[in-house]
Amino acid sequence: MENFIQSFLQERGYTVNDKAQTIIKSCDNWYANRCIEDFHQRKTVQGTPYELSRMNFAKRCCADDANLCEIAEVNGGENEAQHEYLLDMLEKNRFLSMYRKQIENVSAKGTAACYVRLDQAEIAQDGSVSGGRIRLNYIKAENFIPLTVENDEIKEAAFAGTELKGGKVRTTLVDFILDKNGNYVSETNVFDEYGTRIPELTTVVQLGEVKPFAVLRNAEVNNIDNMTGYGYPKLWGAIGVLKAVDLCFNVLYGDLDKADKLVLVNELLCKFDELGNPITPNEQLKKTFVMLGGEKLPEQKDLVQEINPTIRIDDITKAFELCLSLLSMMFGYGTKKYSFENGQIKTATEYAGERQDSMQELNKQRAEAENYIRDICRAILWFSNTFQGTTWNVDEEITADFDDSYVTDRQSELESKRADALSFSSIPKLTIWYLMDKYNLSEEEANKIYAEGQVDIDTDAETED
């Protein structure tokens, strides 16, 4: 976060949490696979600088975490027109793809946010607004500033972002503050590349009691001191293990890098050119054979001696296993989230498909995600009613369907539905549901096929007319 943003908020009586921003920045460095100066940069015993290789396993962990909380569809309520409107607005704002990125960032840095804004709206002198296009702004943890938190609920917040406009850097700060009547007031301030506020671009808009922003946080309790309003960044607790994973990889890489076979050859066996250089049959042998004088051989009685460096694969594998088990526990999915089995590394998504003991952790995060989606949709509906003259039901129950393909075995699920349909053949609905799921049909299409008897469920083949 820019220093002038912090100073501006402090002048208005707010405190910016420096410690939280420091922790978030540290987690972001690991997530972005940046070189950590005090860890990855090393020196040899001769003082020659070198850099450790990096596996970028932090990104892998966060991506797998996000896979388990991916959304399949948002349900906008029983009103079909309202449902379609919400889906259209979310699609125009690329919500599903941006949510996928945000949930991954939440795993890494603990927090993400979104607020609703109006583009190209008409603002009257009294602050009233009409028209415009409803847009969603997606915010990363480093650009989110909680201002007022009550019972762990964020009541007031500010959001900062930097962009390039007309070749000039502009930083925008948007805050949402409650007035004495319990209604939100939005104030937008714009700063130039030097951190100077541009007064003519400042706008103040009177909103209502519906919160115009939503915050997505890690469902796990944040036990880090002085991080009120922020979610727990999982990478923060895993940094030590991530270092160990990189060290394991560098040991393996070092062994492989020095694993080329060497052959020490007595000079008595070599031919030499006119300059005294040994002649080898081809270029490859120059890398393999090393000519030494007879007195330099480890055993002078030997004319040829092979050196085959050892690759410590068993020791390295055990070290990797320990690190991956610790990393699994750090992310809350037991000790087998990542493991070597039959010579293969199993990812979190593969493991969760076989074992269901991670579902409790997952369900907590899904509940948090559903609240986030519900808050965004309510804000969209309120903006539409207030500024565009619609009459949507803001209190309509809004839910999200999550993609369970990562935590369920689809083939086993289909077999179970097929068995139910065969066992209870007197209940046509079971067969229709099976056909819908198996062949990705609508209920109308499945009913038609069932009525015409086009599918024999015993063989899953179409019957002949």
Pin down the residues of each PLM region.
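Extended, compositionally biased alpha-helical segments that mediate assembly or anchoring
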Residues: N447-D465
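Extended, regular secondary-structure scaffolds
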Residues: A113-Y232
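Extended, helix-rich architectural segments
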Residues: M1-T148, E153-I154, E462-D465
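Short acidic alpha-helical/loop segments enriched in Asp/Glu that coordinate divalent cations
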Residues: G332-K346, D375-E396
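Extended, charged amphipathic alpha-helical segments
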Residues: L201-G353, D357, D401-D409
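Extended, non-catalytic structural segments that build the interaction scaffolds
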Residues: K25-R54, E295-M330, K346-N371, E397-Y434
